[in-house]
Amino acid sequence: MLRTMLKSKIHRATVTQADLHYVGSCTIDADLMEAADILEGEQIDIVDIDNGNRLTTYAITGDRGTGVIGINGAAARLISPGDLVIIIGYAQYSEEDLKNYASRVVFVDGNNKQVELGGDPAQVPDGSGLKNPRHPEA
């Protein structure tokens, strides 16, 4: 049996551009793609924290060090520049693969620069003001 598990997450990135007239996809800074273990062409989900929209597309490598998070094509009708998003990649793992399973969770600042890298999907960075889903009362 294969299980579909979280593989990659870029948490609370800020959308820097959106253009209807691009080929559909999401352009992501190469540094963030590398940190999150996302490859060009890989299927990703994007969740818009500001409006609740969720969509599936694929990743395109953006210029390294620019912090670009670009929403391209029809998705630009659902997600706008300035919106906070979560970019998620999944993979299928066998029971054997799961013995060594760890996700890559990348937290970024307001300029989409990496501030923390972890492997726990429920991780909450210190001082972020976010709630831990395992301990919401804390």
Curated annotation (Swiss-Prot):
Pathway: Cofactor biosynthesis; (R)-pantothenate biosynthesis; beta-alanine from L-aspartate: step 1/1. It catalyses: L-aspartate + H(+) = beta-alanine + CO2. The keyword Cytoplasm applies. Substrate binds at T57, G73, A74, A75. GO terms for biological process: alanine biosynthetic process; pantothenate biosynthetic process. Binds 1 pyruvoyl group covalently per subunit. It is an enzyme of class 4 (lyase). Its EC number is 4.1.1.11. It comes from the Bacteria. The keyword Lyase applies. It is found in: Cytoplasm. The modification Pyruvic acid (Ser) is found at S25. Keywords: Autocatalytic cleavage, Cytoplasm, Decarboxylase, Lyase, Pantothenate biosynthesis, Pyruvate, Schiff base, Zymogen. Heterooctamer of four alpha and four beta subunits. This is Aspartate 1-decarboxylase. It comes from Corynebacterium jeikeium (strain K411).
